């Protein structure tokens, strides 16, 4: 098990050199680090951290990641700014051939918005698509969802275009059968007024409302949608009112009728994927017992998240990107457990059932 902590001074478009060192002294994956359900976790397959490395820390605050593998290259996108919320927020895209040496590909800025929470996908016609949001902290309508496209593998990007409805945050887009789906949550300051809307797009540039108001409890926030092999859909949803337990939504085609249920943990920044064997693994921020970024098995039938691996993390942390590649799960995330809020990359081995 190795954990690499190597960052050299930044040179634009010059690769970062990274050297592996042991994680054993700095990270303990003891049972005390794990928050599980009341089930006997001894029978649960537990992923193993193989390697981790810090890959970027050049801004004062580096956060909110996503990860993509495209044309045999790794793409990681995240926000750079002077603080967690600051008017100078910009979106940095870095690339790597091997996951060790990274170089800056693009920096997307705005004179008007604090740019936040970028997500990367590939459109059906092969373009890179970057979703994010522009924030004006003191405005009546604070958030505007936006999209950018690149036809040259991330070297240049189109001007940002607003999508969805003003004040609704389309947090992540998922492509399914040629259509992009995105949950958008209302960003009222009063969290009890925050509702959820489902959007759909043919091209990623124009999102139409598919369901105006879903029946998810008020106070909803960040989400991720998973389309399963049987064509059913799941939505893992952050919930920030009442007991603050995460929500799980389920739907069948055409995805207009969603059923919601409480899960057993409070979460933030959710992402998830389905393994080839059908199991579902989620990456989230967990709160009980200390804030951290962790992997959990999602049990949709019983409505449970079962934590199985705490990543080296703490403090200001979460917002993971997930890619399954050559038998390992690659995870980008951000954390401040080493002091400065920085971008990390972990590789995890997932045991078979």
List the predicted regions and their residue ranges.
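Bacterial N-terminal signal peptides
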Residues: 11-25
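N-terminal secretory signal peptides that target proteins for export/translocation
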Residues: 1-7
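Beta-rich carbohydrate-recognition and catalytic domains
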Residues: 29-63, 68-115, 122-315, 324-329, ...
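General secretory precursor processing signal
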Residues: 7-9, 204
């Amino acid at each position: 098990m190795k954990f690499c902590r190597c960052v050299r001074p930044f040179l634009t478009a010059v690769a970062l050199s990274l050297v592996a060192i042991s994680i054993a002294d700095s990270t303990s994956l003891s049972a005390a680090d794990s928050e599980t359900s009341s089930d006997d976790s001894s029978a649960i397959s537990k992923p193993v951290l193989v390697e981790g490395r810090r890959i970027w820390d050049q801004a004062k605050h580096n956060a909110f990641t996503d990860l993509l593998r495209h044309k045999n290259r790794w793409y990681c996108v995240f926000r750079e700014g002077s603080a967690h919320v600051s008017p100078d927020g910009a979106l940095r895209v870095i690339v790597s051939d091997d996951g060790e040496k990274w170089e800056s590909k693009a920096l997307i800025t705005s004179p008007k918005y604090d740019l936040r929470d970028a997500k990367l996908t590939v459109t059906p016609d092969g373009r890179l698509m970057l979703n994010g949001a522009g924030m004006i902290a003191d405005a009546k309508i604070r958030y505007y969802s936006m999209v950018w496209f690149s036809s040259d593998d991330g070297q240049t990007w189109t001007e940002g275009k607003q999508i969805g409805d003003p004040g609704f945050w389309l947090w992540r887009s998922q492509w399914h059968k040629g259509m992009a789906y995105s949950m958008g949550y209302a960003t009222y300051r009063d969290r009890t007024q925050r509702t959820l809307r489902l959007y759909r797009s043919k091209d990623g540039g124009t999102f139409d409302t598919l369901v105006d108001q879903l029946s998810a409890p008020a106070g909803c926030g960040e989400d991720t949608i998973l389309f399963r092999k049987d064509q059913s859909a799941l939505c893992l949803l952050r919930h920030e009112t009442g007991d603050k337990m995460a929500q799980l939504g389920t739907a069948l085609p055409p995805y207009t009728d969603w059923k919601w249920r409480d899960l057993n943990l409070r979460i933030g920044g959710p992402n998830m994927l389905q393994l080839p064997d059908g199991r579902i693994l989620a990456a989230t921020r967990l709160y009980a017992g200390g804030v951290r970024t962790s992997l959990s098995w999602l049990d949709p039938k019983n409505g449970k998240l079962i934590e199985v691996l705490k990543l080296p993390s703490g403090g200001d942390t979460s917002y993971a990107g997930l890619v399954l590649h050559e038998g390992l799960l690659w995870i980008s995330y951000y954390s401040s457990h080493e002091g400065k809020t920085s971008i990390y990359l972990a590789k995890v081995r997932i045991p078979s059932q």
